[in-house]
A protein has these predicted regions:
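Peripheral, non-AAA+ core regions of ATP-driven protein-machinery
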Residues: 96, 104-109, 117-315
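A glycine-rich phosphate-binding loop feature that marks nucleotide/adenosyl-phosphate handling sites
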Residues: 33-37, 60, 77-83, 170-179, ...
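Residue-level marker of structural boundaries
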Residues: 16-17, 62, 92, 263, ...
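Glycine/threonine-rich ATP-lid/beta-loop region of ATP-binding domains
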Residues: 47-111
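Conserved C-terminal "switch" segment of AAA+ ATPases
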Residues: 1-58, 63-76, 158-167, 205-208
Length: 315
């Protein structure tokens, strides 16, 4: 996958000249600012490569060419505003969308690796009255099914030490869902995300903003290394995540990530699920304990008379 700066350089050096040429325009008739290219990359494409970026650039060139042919202008300097005018409503909404989707307990963004590069994978957990029922949906494969069951078993086995409500799993059914149901998903690297989503749901603690994670887990709560670290980190950066939780044994895989990306993000290396939960979830809210109004002992009045109601006894 390419970084955002690499995509801008490729667009200026190759994609824009080619689309201008293929659409019968002169180089001075349509120009793109870096800001406009950034808008296309962030709001209209979400990919590791540049194919979608070139298609959007081509669409803008065609619309600009049509306006030039109709006499509505001689030259177009493409800005972010013109991008939105030519391409209409943005497809993706960046960090704001992520924060909105994770504003409730039980929803956690994970990092996935696909044939198209890295991507964000949301894990959603909900509960229903019942008892011990568990289902996972979202077009997932056998390995991910097993990861989900391992995550549930770990959380149930640690319920007391995690401070989860007593008897919760005996009284509720659990449903895990991974959206984009038409896209097949598989692999073990969503284990930490599933475990975190379950604890978040049961405890009511939301995931911290701008945070993503990846890692396989064991029944004993160990976090194992995974693949596709570079692609996952690039996807996190593309989507506005500022913090990424990684297995400690993947630490050296960051050598493949460009320095500009590493400097702009925070990485937390974990060995256990407890490490993940401490880093990912908001601190539990302390319940306001009712203050006991202990009665102060009343001093026995001294001998003597006093007409002052504010004092007992003498001066």
């Amino acid at each position: 996958g390419y970084t955002e700066n690499e995509k801008i350089s490729i667009a200026k050096g190759y994609l824009i000249p080619r689309q201008i040429r293929e659409n019968g325009l002169r180089p001075d008739e349509v120009t793109f600012s870096d800001e406009s290219l950034q808008t296309i990359i962030r709001s209209y494409t979400r990919e590791a490569g540049v194919r979608g970026l070139e298609r959007k650039i081509g669409a803008i060139c065609r619309k600009a060419g049509t306006r030039i042919a109709e006499g509505e202008g001689k030259k177009f300097s493409i800005t972010s505003e013109l991008v939105e005018e030519f391409l209409e409503h943005p497809i993706y909404f960046g960090p704001e969308e992520l924060n909105e989707r994770t504003s409730l307990p039980g929803i956690v963004p994970g990092l996935a690796y696909t044939s198209f590069g890295g991507d964000i994978l949301f894990i959603e957990a909900t509960r229903m009255p019942g008892g011990r029922g568990f289902q996972v949906t979202g077009s997932i494969g056998n390995v991910m099914q097993e990861s989900a069951r391992a995550a549930l078993s770990y959380v149930r086995s640690r319920a007391e030490s995690l401070g989860l409500p007593e008897g919760f799993f005996e009284k509720n059914d659990i449903h895990l869902h991974i959206p984009s149901g038409a896209t097949p998903k598989d692999g073990p690297s969503a284990g930490v995300t599933m475990a975190t989503a379950l604890v978040s749901l049961v405890s009511g603690r939301k995931v911290k903003p701008h945070l993503g994670m990846t890692g396989e887990i064991t029944l004993r709560g160990q976090v194992l290394p995974i693949g596709g670290v570079k692609e996952k980190v690039l996807a996190a950066n593309r989507n506005g995540l500022r913090t990424v939780i990684l297995p400690k044994r993947n630490q050296f895989d960051l050598e493949d990530v460009p320095d500009e990306i590493k400097k702009s993000m925070k990485f937390i290396y974990v060995e256990t699920v407890d490490d993940v939960l401490n880093a990912a979830l908001e601190k539990p809210k302390l319940t306001n304990k009712k203050k006991t109004n202990a009665k102060k002992p009343v001093k026995s009045p001294k001998k003597g008379k006093s007409n002052d109601k504010g004092h007992v006894g003498g001066r």
